[in-house]
Each structure stands twice: as C-alpha cells, then as structure tokens.
Amino acid sequence: MTNVQLVTNNLIHKLERYMDDAKSIYILTSFVMKSGVDVLAPLLRKAVEKNVDIKVCTGDYLYITQPDALEKLYDIHPDIEIRLWRSAGKSFHPKAYLFERESDGVMIVGSSNMSRSALTSGVEWSLLVKESVGEEAFSEAIDQFLHIHMNEATQPINIETIKQYRKEYEEF
C-alpha cells in the first residue's frame, strides 16, 4: 500500500486493518449513528480487550447524533472514553480516525461520519496518510484531537449525560 491513499468506499476495511494492531485509537466524528456503532462495535470491543487506548469525540451539532448510538457506544466497554462536544449551535463537522501503532501512525481524514453507510457503501472520500509521510501533520492531528477531546466544550458520556442529551434531542 502507498503511504497516501484516497479511500472512496468500504472505509471499514481500512479501519479494521489499522485497529487490529493499534496502541491507541482516536475517533473524531461530528455525528454518530446507531448503524455506525453496530459496524464498529466488534472492532472496538476487540481492541479494548487488548488494552488499546480508545477515545471517541462526537458532537451535538444539529442533534444528528442519535442518543441510542451514544448509549450503544457507551455500553461496549467502560474503558472507552467518549465525550460529546456541546456546540451551542456552532458548526462542529470534523471526521478523523487516528491510529498510533508500534511501527507507525495512520490518520484517515475525510467525509465519513460514524454511520453504516459512511463506513461501508456510501459515497465518501477520505485521505489515508501514514505517519512516515506526514509526521508533522500526524503529530498535529493527535494534539488537536486531544485538545478537542478534553476541551471545556465537551462533556463525558455516561448514563446521566445520555439521558440529558436524549431529552434535548427529542425536543429539537
């Protein structure tokens, strides 16, 4: 495989490949749908059972993220650190999948949210870049992810915050 690749379909195959031997997995998607969690759950469960550091950050922008998706993601394993960006109406639209591995790092940045369609059969474009080609960009992506993930605009996902978000979602 080349060090830079355009991925236009079946992103799930790339995610599976890089999740398999990752030391850390960082997922940043503006929206999370239950269908996407259904696709990723087995891979996330397998990774967390190997003590992989997994962090997920999604947003409440336009209330597209489904409460059931957050609940299903939360139920995978308590060691997966999930946070919700509280947008206050401001656009929140990133999509990135970052993998730190023993040999290298890989970042996939593009149009794919966490939905079955985006991960499997939808028309999506993502750029896969290996750390060896874009070391500075990869390092910056990790730093920016961690900055967003721990930003004061985010809140940890737990039973109470899911309940609160569900109420807001239903009222929107």
Language-model regions, residue ranges each:
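PLD/PLD-like phosphodiesterase catalytic module centered on the HKD motif
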Residues: 1-172
